[in-house]
Amino acid sequence: MELLKEQIREVARVEKGNVLKVDSFLNHQLDIPLLNEIGKELKKRFQGEKVDKILTAEVSGIAIAAIAAQYFNVPVVFAKKTQSKNLDQDTYEGEVYSYTKGQAYKIRVSKRYLHEKENILIIDDFLANGEALQGLREIVVQANANLVGAGIVIEKGFQGGGKRLRAENMRIESLAIIDEMNESTLVFRDDKADLKADPKAS
């Protein structure tokens, strides 16, 4: 998606540890016009597929999923990372390992909101090692629902999660795939051009 790639080139920052900072438009401050275009593009990528619900994980996936859901005209269900009193005790659970935190945690969805044979589309902001996507898939499997696929805004192709999950026959549509990155360069899979970061953005 060219508009998304241009935004990444112009304002994203790459920090140590393969951290891509897109908090100015995607996961802290939100660029709503851009998110609308992302929603339209995800709808186009899954055109013709029957989707009953969109599933994502809190927190960063919620805004993207909610805006995309307008174009699919379906509800959004988000997996919660904490066990709280206002979450039903009867839940589906997936396990996610966080490489940044160095620990595993559970994500949960009430059984009220995912049902057998429903067609579920997963939407999330990032795909790196694939742990979050795998945890969300576990929840879909437990619900005996049908996984339509996953719509991802940014995939770090060099971290291998997308390759592994595609090899397991999961359909993944990533709007921007980064195959190489460092503090001065980003290389997108579909153009393989060295894209020098704007020094003003750092």
UniProtKB/Swiss-Prot annotation:
Can you name a GO cellular component term?
cytoplasm
Gene Ontology process terms (BP): purine ribonucleoside salvage; xanthine metabolic process; XMP salvage
| GO molecular function annotation | xanthine phosphoribosyltransferase activity
Which Gene3D superfamilies does the record associate with it? Answer: 3.40.50.2020
Pathway(s):
Purine metabolism; XMP biosynthesis via salvage pathway; XMP from xanthine: step 1/1
Where does the chain bind 5-phospho-alpha-D-ribose 1-diphosphate?
Answer: A128, N129, G130, E131, A132
Q: Specify the superkingdom.
A: Bacteria
Pfam families for the chain:
Pribosyltran
Binding residue positions for xanthine? L20, N27, K156
Q: Which reaction does it catalyse?
A: XMP + diphosphate = xanthine + 5-phospho-alpha-D-ribose 1-diphosphate
- Function comment: Converts the preformed base xanthine, a product of nucleic acid breakdown, to xanthosine 5'-monophosphate (XMP), so it can be reused for RNA or DNA synthesis.
Sorted alphabetically, which HAMAP family does this protein's record hold?
Answer: XPRTase
Under the subunit heading, UniProt states: Homodimer.
Q: What is this protein called?
A: Xanthine phosphoribosyltransferase
The gene is xpt
